[in-house]
């Protein structure tokens, strides 16, 4: 993703849970040296266009982030159609159904709410500037 060779998405929001990491139901369980992920994420920008997803899930040690290639068996990203807004980008549900990942797919040293909340805080800057730009554009000299 850093080189622009892959599109990624950020899987935190859940249906009926919003972006509240403390109430998420998506789970990741250790199975030997691997991880098993189950659950779903909702309203994910670029979900079906991504080659990589960062999925946040409850583990026995707290919330963890997982790097998931979207070609992994058990992963699907159905497109959400007929949205009322945010039509400039594709929005998807991310579904993990008995998805298996190697042990090193977990983001190292990221445990608890700090991981997903720090990402959300950074994203808020982009959202703010996007709105400010739209409001200010008519008054900028062309």
Q: Over which residues does each language-model region extend?
A:
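A short, Trp-centered hydrophobic/proline-enriched beta-strand micro-motif
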Residues: 4-12
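A structural signal for short hydrophobic beta-strand segments in well-ordered beta-sheet cores
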Residues: 26-28
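Short Gly/Pro-enriched turn/cap motifs at secondary-structure boundaries
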Residues: 16-19, 43-46, 58, 83-90
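A short core secondary-structure module
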Residues: 40-77
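Structural signature of FAD isoalloxazine-binding scaffolds in flavoprotein oxidoreductases
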Residues: 4, 20-24, 69, 95, ...
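Glycine-rich beta->alpha junctions and the first turn(s) of the following alpha-helix
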Residues: 77-142
């Amino acid at each position: 993703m850093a080189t622009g060779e892959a599109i990624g998405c950020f899987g935190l929001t859940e249906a009926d849970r919003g972006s509240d990491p403390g109430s998420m139901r998506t789970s990741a369980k250790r199975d030997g040296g691997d991880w098993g992920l189950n659950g779903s994420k909702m309203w994910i920008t670029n979900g079906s266009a991504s080659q990589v997803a960062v999925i946040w899930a409850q583990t026995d040690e707290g919330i963890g982030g997982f790097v998931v290639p979207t070609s992994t068996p058990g992963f699907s990203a159905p497109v959400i159609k007929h949205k009322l807004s945010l039509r400039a980008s594709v929005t998807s549900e991310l579904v993990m159904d008995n998805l298996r990942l190697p042990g090193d797919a977990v983001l190292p040293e990221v445990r608890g709410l700090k991981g997903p909340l720090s990402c959300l805080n950074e994203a808020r800057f982009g959202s703010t500037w996007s709105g400010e730009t739209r409001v200010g554009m008519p008054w900028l000299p062309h």
